[in-house]
Amino acid sequence: MAKGEGHILAQNKKARHDYHIVETVEAGIVLTGTEIKSVRAARIQLKDGFAQIKNGEAWLVNVHIAPFEQGNIWNADPERTRKLLLKKREITHLANELKGTGMTLVPLKVYLKDGFAKVLIGLAKGKHDYDKRETIKRRDQERDIKKQMKHYNAR
């Protein structure tokens, strides 16, 4: 399977609007039993999440996984920091890239791959407001061109 393929459970569509994605990395997530059940039920929010590297380990911060309904006392804190499973070489590469100005790690999507929950992390640089407007303008122009081509080819 190619990188990022699998049953997509959650996507962070706002991330591609707010950031220039330089590169992507697939990482596993350390979850408790009730958390993986909630993730498989697609009860996960990536909107405010980000990843950081501390003491040679990668961590996923501010990602909300809703408590499992039948979890009772086994439910963990929905906003807890979760460890990401990456190779040491990938962590050092990302740590070196993060030293650049304005770089951050953003979760792009969560999906299941061979029964395991994976997160696609993007190394990103923040966009300015004029970049966002330019992206919207370019997307609208492409949509208009496709509409005109479709109308022209229908004749």
UniProtKB/Swiss-Prot annotation:
According to the lineage, what is the superkingdom?
Answer: Bacteria
Could you tell me which PROSITE patterns the record lists for this protein?
SSRP (PS01317)
Where does it live in the cell? Answer: Cytoplasm
Keyword Cytoplasm: yes or no? Answer: yes
**Keywords associated with the record:** Cytoplasm, RNA-binding
The GO biological-process annotations, alphabetized, read as: trans-translation
InterPro entries from the UniProt entry = SmpB, SsrA-bd_prot, SsrA-bd_prot_CS
Q: Which Pfam families match?
A: SmpB (PF01668)
Query: GO cellular-component terms in the record?
Result: cytosol
Q: Which GO terms describe its molecular function?
A: RNA binding
**PANTHER family from the xrefs?**
SSRA-BINDING PROTEIN, TMRNA-BINDING COMPONENT OF TRANS-TRANSLATION TAGGING COMPLEX
Q: What does this protein do?
A: Required for rescue of stalled ribosomes mediated by trans-translation. Binds to transfer-messenger RNA (tmRNA), required for stable association of tmRNA with ribosomes. tmRNA and SmpB together mimic tRNA shape, replacing the anticodon stem-loop with SmpB. tmRNA is encoded by the ssrA gene; the 2 termini fold to resemble tRNA(Ala) and it encodes a 'tag peptide', a short internal open reading frame. During trans-translation Ala-aminoacylated tmRNA acts like a tRNA, entering the A-site of stalled ribosomes, displacing the stalled mRNA.
Q: Which family does it belong to?
A: Belongs to the SmpB family.
State what protein this is by name.
SsrA-binding protein
**Species assigned in the record:** Streptococcus pyogenes serotype M4 (strain MGAS10750)
- From which lineage does this chain's organism come? Bacteria, Bacillati, Bacillota, Bacilli, Lactobacillales
